[in-house]
């Protein structure tokens, strides 16, 4: 009988272990109620900064830049406006080493375009910039396609759009000024980055790395190429030339100045047309 009693005791203990214990039960977690504002529009700030390649921000000195943000799916313009402000901190942008994640253009106040959009879902947009607006002949355009996510602001440096080129302007002779055949004339041109910074020897924008030259055209034909040299005046480069004969240029000539830096990808052209006269005209007499 002893073994039977032992077996019964073991069965009782086993049943107690396996029996459910209601007092120790863990209630199931309740799901949280849905967020009633989940589909509400969320204000999303986008900052766009237009800069000149290898240079500063396009600020008020060069007329700034126009920025347009367009919804890719619908083609609808979401925002448009002007970038205005200063060109930025030259020492920080051009001379100070920095890590990739460190702000470059926003360490000090600089020109930017800022807008806030009410977004309910992620959208893909084209952000386009055109400038410098004060120099239409040198104006460039650039576009970048990105995603915008509701509630995720793009600030600090923001979306940086880079324009390539130079502002090249013929300063002398003045565009449209009549030229006298066979006269010895000095061609002068100024060269600046698209942000308005001066291009000159030994500067942050070193003209020694840039091929700067002039051309004389009759019609579409180049009749002479001129190597231009720094004149010592701000952003000034010059080269002398002789005005062609009237019989060779009855419709006048075109003067062209070119700045080319293949290493950086920056190029700029300035040109103007001039009538050619066969002789000097006497000054007009003023009526008494």
Language-model segment annotations:
Residues 31-37, 147-197, 278-288:
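Short, compositionally biased P/S/T/A/G/V-rich stretches that sit at domain boundaries
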Residues 242-249:
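Short, surface-exposed loop/turn segments at beta-strand-coil junctions that are enriched for proline
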Residues 73-81, 218-227, 266-267:
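Surface-exposed loop/edge segments in extracytoplasmic proteins
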Residues 88-113, 232-242:
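Aromatic sugar-binding surface patches on proteins
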Residues 59-66, 202-212:
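Short coil-to-beta strand junction motifs in C2/discoidin
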Residues 48-59, 190-205:
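Short amphipathic, basic-aromatic surface patches that mediate peripheral association
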Residues 120-140, 260-269:
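Short acidic/polar inter-strand loop motif in beta-rich domains
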